């Protein structure tokens, strides 16, 4: 646990007295209350998260998370074999039950939003040049499928793969390359929780189902804002410089773009290398077309 003001380590957040009374602990270094969000309502905490208040993020990813993690053993069972394997998995599901449910909700919304956005982008912007120049586009062939379930599965794989790469690369970069969090007990969980909290901004376009307007432009703006949320939240939690976080995020974006599309092309083409190459060439030509014509490049 840490002081949300100066980030120094502390032993406790408050002292409990009879009658459910508590006294918040003062920080030995800065003299401020260690974590004033202990007494905050969840609604006020959520508002401060939206406003990117550093204290709100530090309260959740450091203090609140550690309190939850301490309820469970840090390591799995010592039993070997299939029984021990099953018990470890059950412990993992209990330990991360709340976080997993939030992830499932976010992914479900993100899949639907991507499906809706990609369909509109293809019909409004990509179909005409693809037909004119004979490009084979992943999105076009997937949206032409008659089975909606297959379309949904494609975008589900897209979202989950994209999120998995973001999550894995961010953790590896911070924990192994920059050696951040060496003195933290739950460093991996802290990074994961930070990504979860900031990633939630990506589902705000779901409100456009209630109040329709120029959805493509608005969705793109919100996605750029969500990317800013991720950068800012990682800076708050890790205390790294903006230049480091932006460089890290740019590198991860490039890796995600290079890795994910070829994998999806192989899946859609069912392992047909020639067809997969056509998809990748079509995506490359589309990117060049958008860049050279400066058409919907930020959508």
Curated annotation (Swiss-Prot):
The chain crosses the membrane at residues 99-116, 149-169, 190-210, 211-231, 245-265. The keyword tRNA processing does not apply. It is a multi-pass membrane protein. It holds the Pfam family Arv1. Its main location: endoplasmic reticulum. Coiled coil: none annotated. It comes from the Eukaryota. Glycans are attached at residue 176. GO terms for biological process: intracellular sterol transport; regulation of plasma membrane sterol distribution; sphingolipid metabolic process; sterol metabolic process. It is found in: Endoplasmic reticulum membrane; Golgi apparatus membrane. One of its GO terms (cellular component) is Golgi membrane. Keywords: Endoplasmic reticulum, Glycoprotein, Golgi apparatus, Lipid metabolism, Lipid transport, Membrane, Sphingolipid metabolism, Transmembrane, Transmembrane helix, Transport. Mediator of sterol homeostasis involved in sterol uptake, trafficking and distribution into membranes. Also regulates the sphingolipid metabolism. PANTHER family: ARV1, PROTEIN ARV1. Belongs to the ARV1 family. This is Protein ARV1. It comes from Eremothecium gossypii (strain ATCC 10895 / CBS 109.51 / FGSC 9923 / NRRL Y-1056).
């Amino acid at each position: 646990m840490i002081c949300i003001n100066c980030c120094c380590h502390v032993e406790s957040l408050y002292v409990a007295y009879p009658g459910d009374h508590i006294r918040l602990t003062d920080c030995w270094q800065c003299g401020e209350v260690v974590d004033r969000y202990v007494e905050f309502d969840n609604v006020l905490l959520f508002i401060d998260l939206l406003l990117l208040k550093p204290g709100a993020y530090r309260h959740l990813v450091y203090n609140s998370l550690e309190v939850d993690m301490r309820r469970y053993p840090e390591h799995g069972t010592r039993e070997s074999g299939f029984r021990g394997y099953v018990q470890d998995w059950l412990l993992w599901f209990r330990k991360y039950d709340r976080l997993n449910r939030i992830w499932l909700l976010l992914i479900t919304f993100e899949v639907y939003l991507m499906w809706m956005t990609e369909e509109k982008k293809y019909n409004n912007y990509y179909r005409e040049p693809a037909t004119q120049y004979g490009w084979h586009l992943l999105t076009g062939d997937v949206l032409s499928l008659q089975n909606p379930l297959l379309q949904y599965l494609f975008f589900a794989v897209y979202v989950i793969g994209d999120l998995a790469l973001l999550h894995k690369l961010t953790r590896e970069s911070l924990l192994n390359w920059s050696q951040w969090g060496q003195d933290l007990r739950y460093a991996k969980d802290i990074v994961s929780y930070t990504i979860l909290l900031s990633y939630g901004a990506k589902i705000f376009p779901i409100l456009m189902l209630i109040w329709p307007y120029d959805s493509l432009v608005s969705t793109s703006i919100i996605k750029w804002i969500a990317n800013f949320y991720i950068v800012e939240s990682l800076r708050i939690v890790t205390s790294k410089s903006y230049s480091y976080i932006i460089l890290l995020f740019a590198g991860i974006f490039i890796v995600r773009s290079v890795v994910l599309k070829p994998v999806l092309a192989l899946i859609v083409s069912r392992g047909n290398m020639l067809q997969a190459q056509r998809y990748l060439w079509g995506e490359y030509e589309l990117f060049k077309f958008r860049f050279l014509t400066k058409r919907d490049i930020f959508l």
